[in-house]
Amino acid sequence: MHVKYLAGIVGAALLMAGCSSSNELSAAGQSVRIVDEQPGAECQLIGTATGKQSNWLSGQHGEEGGSMRGAANDLRNQAAAMGGNVIYGISSPSQGMLSSFVPTDSQIIGQVYKCPN
């Protein structure tokens, strides 16, 4: 009886810990930079990426710093995985009315470029 109870508690704790983690910046993601000016002709546009941070269990809303930081880390990690090293034109989709009451995912979208170093 005690073993089943303990197993249930451990399982629930692992589930909650897994769902509430924030996006960590990978080693490859650290080399991706975000720029304000559109990259020049020497850079190749690879595509568009979306960084997301789940806020459901953390209770954060999209405007909070930690939430957007996690989404930015995810965006930089995705850009690196695509072979890019520069992100330009970052935007965040508008939050709906539901996000005022329920913590929803934070998202950041940007264009991924491969530029010479």
UniProtKB/Swiss-Prot annotation:
GO BP, sorted A to Z = DNA damage response
The entry's keywords: Signal
Instruction: Show the InterPro entries listed in the entry.
Output: DUF4156
Leader sequence residues: 1-22
State the protein's name.
Answer: Uncharacterized protein YjeI
Native source organism of the sequence: Escherichia coli (strain K12)
Query: What's the source species' lineage?
Result: Bacteria, Pseudomonadati, Pseudomonadota, Gammaproteobacteria, Enterobacterales
Encoding gene per record: yjeI
